[in-house]
Amino acid sequence: MVMSQGTYTFLTCFAGFWLIWGLIVLLCCFCSFLRRRLKRRQEERLREQNLRALELEPLELEGSLAGSPPGLAPPPPPHRSRLEAPVHAHSHVHVHPLLHHGPAPPHAHPHPHHHALPHPPPPHLAVPPRPWSYPRQAESDMSKPPCYEEAVLMAEPPPPYSEVLTDTRGLYRKIVTPFLSRRDSAEKQEQPPPSYKPLFLDRGYTSALHLPSAPRPAAPCPALCLQAERSRRVFPSWTDSELSSREPLEHGAWRLPVSIPLFGRTTAV
């Protein structure tokens, strides 16, 4: 069977289309592979930099003790103090003030490079302090809340963040807090208790319903008016004691004696 020219052209186009599509897919897969590999290398490089920074952090802390606050002085090296301790003990030979009549002679220093050593720091300052344990007095901006390490090491917990936001002076309101609490409690005591009386007690049943406007009817008869006034006097409130102490209910065909407040939609048809 011989293929016609049209069939040959169709098969050639079909094969070429799928071949080009396959090459595009392979190219996309290769690009994604390269991107993932570059991203992995970048993450490894960042991880190595972080590890190096963590390893060099103690050295930086030891070097930064020279610029620490005045109360925190770096301790002297221990080997130097051990070597110079006996020399320092022999050099200080004092004469009794009653036996000495004249200017005090200078102390003889047997070692030419000897000089006075500073006083050793207290034992609680011998350990190099952490950077977050420095006092915050040197900082200019006190409106920022403390970091997590400072909040953990603080003797008193920091004020809530709402107080920091409402503070207009830029300082924590630790001193003003008790006065504010007293003033708020006084204001709460001065406020009258809320009244729980129901609404629309002296109005009709349809006063809470928004009905379309209609032509006003004629004036009712005086008997109905007297009955309405009497029902208003009989049921002034919702309390059971007043309901039991009043006269019995006289049913009226045109309105309810006690108005019930209605809000929203009703089920009336």
UniProtKB/Swiss-Prot annotation:
GO terms for molecular function: long-chain fatty acid binding; protein tyrosine kinase binding; ubiquitin-like protein ligase binding. Residues 146-166 are annotated as: Required for internalization. Residues 108-117 have a biased composition (Basic residues). It is found in: Cell membrane; Postsynaptic cell membrane; Postsynaptic density membrane; Cytoplasm, Perinuclear region. A motif (PDZ-binding) lies at residues 267-269. The chain crosses the membrane at residues 10-30. Residues 1-9 are extracellular. Residues 31-269 are cytoplasmic. The modification Phosphoserine is found at residue 64. It is a single-pass type III membrane protein. Residues 2-39 are annotated as: Required for membrane localization. Keywords: Adaptive immunity, Cell membrane, Cell projection, Cytoplasm, Immunity, Lipoprotein, Membrane, Nucleus, Palmitate, Phosphoprotein, Postsynaptic cell membrane, Signal-anchor, Synapse, Transmembrane, Transmembrane helix. It comes from the Eukaryota. InterPro entries: WW_domain-binding (IPR051994). Residues 63-83, 97-121 are annotated as: Disordered. One of its GO terms (cellular component) is cytosol. Acts as a synapse-to-nucleus messenger to promote NMDA receptor-mediated excitotoxicity in neurons in a JUN-dependent manner. Inhibits ubiquitination-mediated degradation and promotes phosphorylation and transcriptional activity of transcription factor JUN. Might play a redundant role in the regulation of T cell receptor signaling. Might promote apoptosis in T cells. Forms a complex with NMDA receptor zeta subunit GRIN1 and epsilon subunit GRIN2B. Interacts with GRIN2B. Interacts with GRIN1; the interaction is reduced upon NMDA receptor activity. Found in a postsynaptic membrane complex with DLG4 and GRIN1. Interacts with DLG4 (via PDZ3 domain and to lesser degree via PDZ2 domain). Interacts with JUN. Found in a complex with JUN and FBXW7. Interacts with JUN and FBXW7; the interaction inhibits ubiquitination-mediated JUN degradation promoting its phosphorylation and transcriptional activity. Interacts with SRC. This is Proline-rich protein 7. The gene is Prr7.
